[in-house]
């Protein structure tokens, strides 16, 4: 019922602004919300919804806002704002740093999270939730739409199997190399084209890569098309020059220099 009500509100808002959202974007957001409610590789459905609540709360965290203006790598004294006092501190720190100050993520900081009990698979799962929920929420905000209500958690446990070929390549978490695809993740990358590291970043959880690819393709282009697309390859209302200008400005504003 909540989904139906949300769809009706979206339709009303779109009629108000005479704007049409591409169907593939709506469908990709629906898939993000469907997956959000399900048990993940490490987190239960309830824990994933709790992470989503903290993602939304992190955007107005006063402690993060104050630290953003500091010059050092270490944060000042204080605590992150949270919706739940019992929420695990290591998870909270990861969410807030990814949301508000990713430019100051260091290996020492990641190692400290590990020392506090945050495993590499858990790190990747939470990072993927931050990424996907942020995409959906900021899209709604940009169009003046209400945020989607968080879904009800689905009980159960996912049967996660760690990829046998995921290895430490010097990054902060293990990844699957382009020549190490096998089994149920043999099609994870398009090997006909260059595979950037950002495409492999979530590969410790292959299903997360697939969901991220889905968002990437619906909002922009598939990874393999990015270096070579031209205006004749798409039917978007904006040109390649306009898209890349917007992407560059957003990246700069978010301290993303990839």
Where are these regions (language model features)?
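Hydrophobic alpha-helical segments
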Residues: 2-258
């Amino acid at each position: 019922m909540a989904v139906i009500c949300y769809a009706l509100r979206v339709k009303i808002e779109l009629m108000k602004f005479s704007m049409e959202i591409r169907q593939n974007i709506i469908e990709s957001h629906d898939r993000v919300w469907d997956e959000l409610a399900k048990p993940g590789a490490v987190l239960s459905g309830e824990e994933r919804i709790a992470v989503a609540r903290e993602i939304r709360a992190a955007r107005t965290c006063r402690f993060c806002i104050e630290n953003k203006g500091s010059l050092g790598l270490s944060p000042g004294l204080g605590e992150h704002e949270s919706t739940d006092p019992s929420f695990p501190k290591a998870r909270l720190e990861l969410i807030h740093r990814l949301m508000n100050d990713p430019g100051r993520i260091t290996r020492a900081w990641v190692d400290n999270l590990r020392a506090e009990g945050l495993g590499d698979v858990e790190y990747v799962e939470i990072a993927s939730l931050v990424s996907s929920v942020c995409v959906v929420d900021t899209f709604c905000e940009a169009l003046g739409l209400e945020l989607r209500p968080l879904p009800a958690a689905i009980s159960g446990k996912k049967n996660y199997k760690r990829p046998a070929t995921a290895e430490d390549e010097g990054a902060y978490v293990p990844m699957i190399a382009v020549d190490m695809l096998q089994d149920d993740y043999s099609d994870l990358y398009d090997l006909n084209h260059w595979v950037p590291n950002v495409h492999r970043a979530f590969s410790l959880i292959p299903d997360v890569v697939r969901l991220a690819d889905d968002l990437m393709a619906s909002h922009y282009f598939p990874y393999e098309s990015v270096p070579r697309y031209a205006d004749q390859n798409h039917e978007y209302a904006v040109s390649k020059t306009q898209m890349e200008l917007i992407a560059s400005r957003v990246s700069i504003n978010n301290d993303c220099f990839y």
